[in-house]
Regions:
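Long, contiguous, structured domain-core segments that constitute the functional module of a protein
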Residues: 283-442, 447
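Generic, well-ordered alpha-helical scaffold segments in large soluble proteins
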Residues: 98, 102, 118-125, 204, ...
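N-terminal-proximal low-complexity accessory segments that begin disordered
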Residues: 2-145, 152
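Long, charge-patterned amphipathic interaction tracts in eukaryotic proteins
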Residues: 117-190
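Conserved structured core elements
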Residues: 60-63, 82, 89, 93-97, ...
Length: 451
């Protein structure tokens, strides 16, 4: 067998001990498993280098593993006469715990969470998309600062990169495929820079008839957490402060109807663990419980909204049914985490905060798209789909009602779809002898097939 801990304490740095001068347990063990014993021990620090790890042989790796195991036995402080399964499992569990805490530090780092949140949001959208039904998803690697710089460098909007990429290359090019919507993982605040960026995006979106979906976080409301946002007593008066002058002015513009801002974020995945998301390589238990709100992985709700848009398009041919629990606004199968603080299982809801129906109505009237979680259920719902535009008030009720309809995204998606089709009809019928009635009949037949 391997040397005892008593002998290990005497040699400290060595991980292998010879029982006889001519032959060693180490050599005998390697011979039985068809490996060659190494001539010299290496420092364990070199295994922190990925390149050294990849270049090492199986003999060196196993020897290093034996070194670590013998050091664990030495640190136990008690003699070990034999190695049984319980002892080995105990030390394996200790190693798993140490690796788990190191992995926690990586997974819970804000920068890593930002990357994982983005890709898990994209994956959730891709998983819910049937690409056989005339649906395409294209990814554009672009940060919010890069887009802001793009608009600042362009002398005018029509020379910006976003305009060239979306309007010129697709909507305005024969054979191009008009883009139905832009979905972003960006969170906007009410600063002058972000409002100016939203204004520029809205101009491009209106030109190409492609609504833009973004999101807002607690920073938009000048709060630190969404719980503080939900606790604002008079949300209407909150937006009458001087900090929101630019935002309120943007809401008065015509192109603001092409911008949708969702809130709050949703749970991207369950914490890793044998009962939630097991890891096969080792026993990883992620240390996350309900109060550790910042340790959970949250994803942007814009991807959930986009998934509902895709479902509506596949079912109806356009993105109209995207709000209401029975009309396409439900977000199903959200992860539910059960945790125990010593008083029994408790539930971590899959959204950052509970939004009551009254508060949801207030947020919607202020130009946001709230996602409301259904209590004691595994789903949430978009009850409204208002754009950021503030509906105008007119002297007649009909005019005011029309203004409200014009500010709703389902109506904008409908108009955008028709605008895309009209562009194609106009282009394809250049030079033909079709009169207005034939073109009108062709358009009506197309619309009739979608209703």
């Amino acid at each position: 067998m391997l040397m005892s801990v008593q002998k290990e304490n005497n040699v400290a740095g060595n991980a292998v001990s010879e029982t006889h001068s001519g032959d060693s347990v180490y050599a005998s063990l390697f011979e039985k498993i068809n490996l060659n014993p190494v001539s010299a021990l290496s420092a364990l620090d070199i295994w922190q280098d990925p390149q050294a790890m990849s270049e090492a042989s199986a003999d060196e790796r196993l020897t290093a593993g034996m070194q670590v195991f013998m050091e664990c036995l030495a640190k136990a402080g008690a003699p070990v006469e034999k190695l049984d399964k319980a002892l080995i499992d105990h030390h394996i569990a200790e190693l798993d715990y140490q690796i788990s805490r190191q992995l926690d530090a990586v997974l819970h780092h804000p920068e890593f969470q930002k990357v994982e949140s983005l890709w898990r949001g994209v994956k959730s959208l891709v998983d819910k998309t049937d690409f056989r039904r005339n649906v395409k998803i294209e990814l554009l690697d672009l940060s919010k600062d890069d887009l802001r710089q793009d608009f600042e460098d362009a002398p005018e909007i029509i020379q910006s990169g976003l305009y060239l990429q979306t309007y010129v290359a697709e909507y305005d090019t024969p054979g191009g495929e008009p883009i139905a919507a832009l979905i972003s993982a960006w969170e906007f605040d009410a600063s002058a820079q972000d409002v100016a960026l939203l204004k520029n995006i809205s101009r491009v979106a209106a030109s190409a008839h492609m609504p833009f979906i973004g999101s807002v976080g607690p920073a938009f409301f000048r709060k630190d957490t969404m719980e503080e946002v939900a606790a604002i007593k008079d949300i209407g008066n909150h937006f009458e402060r001087a900090e929101y002058i630019k935002w309120n002015a943007f809401r008065e513009t015509d192109d603001a109807r092409y911008i949708g801002l969702v809130m709050p974020r949703v749970l991207g995945r369950l914490p890793y663990g044998p009962d939630t998301v097991p890891v096969r390589s080792f026993n990883y238990v992620e240390e996350v419980k309900g109060p550790d709100h910042h340790k959970y992985l949250w994803t942007n709700a814009s991807f959930a909204f986009a998934a509902n848009m895709v479902r509506s398009f596949v079912t109806n041919g356009w993105c109209v049914q995207i709000r209401g629990p029975q009309a396409g606004g439900a977000v199903q199968d959200l992860p539910i985490h059960l945790y125990d603080l010593g008083t029994g299982n408790q539930v971590k809801i899959p959204s950052e905060v509970m939004i009551p129906e009254t508060r949801e109505f207030e947020f919607a009237n202020l130009g946001f798209i709230p996602l409301s979680y259904y209590k004691n259920r595994d789903y949430a719902c978009f009850f409204s789909a208002n754009s950021t535009q503030k509906p105008a008030l007119y002297d007649t009720p009909d005019a005011t009602a029309n203004s409200r309809i014009n500010a709703r995204l389902p109506y904008i998606f409908l108009l955008s779809r028709i605008a895309h089709y009209l562009k194609i009809i106009q282009r394809e019928n250049i030079g033909t002898t079709k009169d207005r009635r034939l073109l009108e009949l062709e358009l009506n037949n197309w619309i009739r097939g979608l209703v």
